[in-house]
């Protein structure tokens, strides 16, 4: 169809991983629709591409049931204001990127007013609260899933879903040089490094900094030559981690970096990290890992009763096997973490890396382009270079 005015795409990304996905999609849609406007809530990567943020992304980056409750009045105010502004703007499509507890409510209100809605990143309906799929069906015209097993779940319930793969799998080479990463970061070419990634959100660092730092002390005793490297997403998180380091192990040396998490992972011999998207990135970088996580006790008590899965990290979920150790909640102790990390650093991990490589190949689908294809088809926009917008995939 011919556009009489530039397209408007509204998007909301709730945290760092959503900003990465959003930036890829903005770039792909911009290539097709150079005059399009992109507006909503995004992070620095999206904003660097000309995205207009109506609120700071940090407002949405909260975790856990208890933590969300304390911020609920502000979150509801942000959502209400955002919906009002978007209804006035009447975008051609709204794309909620992850953050389902925030975005699905937005999608529902917009869809009821005739605006096309897409949810990019399936909520973990296969893991817990499966009945959410009915609300998702009511709120969205299309779900874009990153993982192959998710589409089958949606197909069972006749909810429109497109498997697009994961942008991280597209962006990260099948082989990433450890030596090159060390040179980039100015690290010793021959030393042994453990990357420590306690998360990107304030709530994660609050829960994980202490056990990770205390574990590092024990790891250093068992492996005296090991060195620690930690990327932190911004100055707030750096200050938060430094405070924890001074409190729990003032004499421990950990080299801190601003961002550069992928380079840090690639430079390492092994990784200790919080559960979440970072576990996928660690898998794609092909480094062995130990995954640990804990939340507020009440949050865990409520959530664990609703869980349908026994595995939490993406390498284990994708493989259907216990490929990497997971230390969740009561198991997330300095002693258990240190024990698993020392074992990981001492073992031959070649078979594990081969499994990671196979999973990487399966997730490589040119995700941003496939997502942009699906959005174009949904809104009936012309595909670029004379290609029919029906030729998706």
UniProtKB/Swiss-Prot annotation:
Keywords assigned by UniProt, alphabetized: Glycosyltransferase, Lipid A biosynthesis, Lipid biosynthesis, Lipid metabolism, Transferase
Name of the protein in question: Lipid-A-disaccharide synthase
Pathway it works in: Bacterial outer membrane biogenesis; LPS lipid A biosynthesis
Enzyme Commission number: 2.4.1.182
Gene name per UniProt: lpxB
Alphabetized GO MF terms: lipid-A-disaccharide synthase activity; phospholipid binding
Family of this protein: Belongs to the LpxB family.
InterPro entries the record matches: Glyco_trans_19
Biological role: Condensation of UDP-2,3-diacylglucosamine and 2,3-diacylglucosamine-1-phosphate to form lipid A disaccharide, a precursor of lipid A, a phosphorylated glycolipid that anchors the lipopolysaccharide to the outer membrane of the cell.
Enzyme category, top tier: transferase
Domain of life: Bacteria
GO CC terms, sorted: membrane
HAMAP family: LpxB
Pfam families hit by this protein: LpxB
Catalytic activity: a lipid X + a UDP-2-N,3-O-bis[(3R)-3-hydroxyacyl]-alpha-D-glucosamine = a lipid A disaccharide + UDP + H(+)
Listed GO biological process terms: lipid A biosynthetic process
